[in-house]
Amino acid sequence: MAPPNKNPNGYYVESFPAPGLRQIVRHITGLNKQGESVFLHSDHGDHHRFMVQNQAISNLLYSTQETPVDLNNNIDIQKAKEKEPPFHYKSGSIVRMIDFGPGVESPLHRAMTIDYGIIVEGVFELILDSGEKRIMRQGDVSVQRATAHKWVNVTGNGTLPGRVMWVLLDCKEVVDAKGEKVEGYLGSLQEHYEGR
């Protein structure tokens, strides 16, 4: 019998990590009562969200709601754990890792952020709204500056899962060459972030 969340493409994700990818470990450090640096937590992240008809899963590794960040009394750790963040925080930061099923394509979207995208496992095609494309492999980095784009997992010619990590930071209002304000849009990704 097929799992209840099996999607039309035959690949499904039931938990993080996605099938075929290794489990990641997040280590959070801090200070002990003597002022020494210590490991406070080692785990797999606080928030996981299924996406794209369960063909992908997002793992929120950390988020901050302000800059500079208040680290006193571990308040930042408490805030990150208590609340699953929106797509991005104004004046904050998010570290998001997404496991993509084979051949999965994100919708075209533009976040009003600066995003550092790092290919952790696999091969991806990064496509801009101009039609320009780049192939990115493990260790390659993209710097998205409020640009419209989508990601396609082409690992194993679209037969294997892949993983990308992003660090999202807020940016000031962006105007294009015509002097018009650039607007963000998430397309079908919006449903995964509404109400947060």
From Swiss-Prot:
- EC top class named in words: oxidoreductase
Judging by the UniProt lineage, the source's domain of life is Eukaryota
Sorted keywords for this record are: Oxidoreductase
Q: What is its EC number?
A: 1.-.-.-
InterPro entries attached to this UniProt entry: OryJ/VirC-like (IPR047142), RmlC-like_jellyroll (IPR014710), RmlC_Cupin_sf (IPR011051)
Which GO terms fall under molecular function for this chain's record?
oxidoreductase activity
Location of the region described as Cupin-like domain in the Swiss-Prot/TrEMBL record: 99-165
The UniProt record lists the keyword Oxidoreductase: yes
Swiss-Prot/TrEMBL induction comment: Expression is up-regulated during sexual development. Expression is also up-regulated during confrontation with the arthropod fungivore Drosophila melanogaster.
Gene3D superfamilies the UniProt entry points to: Jelly Rolls (2.60.120.10)
Record's family? Belongs to the virC family.
Biological role stated in the UniProt entry:
Highly reducing polyketide synthase; part of the gene cluster that mediates the biosynthesis of sordarial, a salicylic aldehyde structurally related to the phytotoxin pyriculol. The most interesting aspect of this pathway is formation of an aromatic product from the highly reducing polyketide synthase srdA. SrdA synthesizes a reduced polyketide chain from one molecule of acetyl-CoA and five molecules of malonyl-CoA. The polyketide chain is then reductively released as an aldehyde.
Name-wise, this protein is Cupin-domain-containing oxidoreductase srdD
